[in-house]
Structure formats: structure tokens, C-alpha cells
Amino acid sequence: MDRSRRLAVSLGLNAGLVVALVAFGIRAHSSGLLADAGHNAVDVGALALSWVAVRFALQPPSAARSFGNHRATILAALGNAVLIAGVTVLIVVDAIHRLGNPQPVHAGIVVVVASAALVVNGAAALVLNDRSGDLNMRAALLHMVGDALASLAVVVAAVVLLLAPTATWLDPVSALVVAAIIAYQAVGVLRSSVAVLLESTPSDVDLDHLTDTIGRVSGVGEVHDLHVWSLSSEMRVLSAHLVLTGHPTLEEAQVVGEHVKVAIAGPYGIAHSTLELECERCHDDDVDPCRMEGAEPPVTIHHH
């Protein structure tokens, strides 16, 4: 199942769940169920946003967007993180209010409905778990995992309420537990999204190690002006200047460039690289690099 369909299935499951949670939350006077409903309502919007982003990112590059729309999924992930933060505040405010004004809770209804919500959220999480590492899908998956954990917290609180009906404070406390889970998710997604948008070096890429890898390629004497960043969760880009040993022909320089691309593609996941190739200086006091035979330096190799 492709990502678009995974998101659509999860969207449908959660839309139906929100209606049920609101209806039974009001009937049972449960802030836990209403908090769960609020979280799921935000998730419906978040899943819709993720679905639109996936569809948008599939569009081919154009003259206006030469790299395509890969950043759309990152923007969706960032938007989801903001939505998560917003719903967290609302849940905390409501829970604090109910702690000061406890209401009787129909724990039996809460147990049944929250258990059903746990099953639905768990199923939605399994649908979204494509193990791709895509930030947009990760954000959507975290929404579902958070929902499942939130439903579990509500179930536990309701079971305790069945055994101790006077412990009405447990219901709003379960809502605060939900809020804590949601906030934790938001921080991780927000941090990763901002890192991509700021074109930070991917966290698993060591620039010194990458420089050594490139430097070990036959024909490469020096590496400088090295940059690595991400267009999306799955597309990494590199640009670098390489000083080649000796005075290679244009064809020989191109072969070195291709060998470098092969060396970095697999281990570092770099799908798009631009290499500017330079010659060694003929003498230490030379200001300009030597000219390659049959070519004007510098030679740029552009690779998709």
C-alpha cells in the first residue's frame, strides 16, 4: 500500500472515531474521553494535511521549482507539530479546570469506548508504519501512537474509577498524561522539521568521516567547501570542491567524479551531488589552479 492510501485509510478511521468519542465523552462526563476526542480531531486535520503534502510532493520538478516539491512533506510535519502543541494546551487547560471542579464519571462507558479507541488507533498506527523514515509519515505515525497511548491511559483511569468511584480526580489526571505524551511527540517532530528547513547537516552524517571517504577515492587530493543538507526526509544533497591530483584530462576528471558519487551514495544516502573539480597547482606560489587539458577550469559535474 502506498503512502497516500495509508494516510487515507487512517484518516477515515480517525474521522469516525472522533464522532464516537465526542458523543460518549459528553454522555459519560469524561474529560479523558473528550481530551482523546480533541487529540483525534487534530489528528484528522493533521492526516489530511499529510495526505495533501504527499500528493503535492509527487508532482514533477518545474521551471519555478527545479527541485520539485519535496519540502511539502516537511512543511506538513512542521504544521502537524504546531497542531499537536495547540491541542496540548487545550487539554491541559480543561484538565486543570476539571481537577478544581470534579464531576461524576460514568466509568463503564469510558472503559468500553476508550478500549475501542485503543483498537482503532492501534490499527491506524500499523497502517501508517511503512518504516521509510519519512518525516511526514513519522509525524502521522506519532499522532496515532500518541492516540493509542492516550486511550490506554484513559482505560486505566476508568478501570480504577470502577473500583474506586470517588477518585474522580483520576479522569483529568489521565488527560494530563495524554497531554504529556503529545508534548513529547511534538518536540521531536518539530526539532527534526526545523533542522531540515534550516538545511542542517543530517544528524547521522559526520562531515569529517565523509571528507575522509571522498579523500580515499583515487585521484582526489583535497576536499573543501563541503556541504550536505536534506531536501526532504529521504532526499539528501551534497556540493563540494575537489582538488584532483596531477593534471587529468576532462575524461579522467569525470571518471574521478563518478567514483566519488558511487562512494558516497550508499553509505550516506546522498541522491543528488554537485562536484566542482579543480587541478593541483603547478607551483606553490600559483594563484589560480592549473587548467585541465582540453577544458576551462573549474569543471562542474552535476548528478541526479
Predicted regions and their residues:
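Alpha-helical transmembrane segments and adjacent TM-loop junctions that form the membrane-embedded core
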Residues: 1-5, 28, 32-34, 38, ...
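First transmembrane helix
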Residues: 8-24, 123
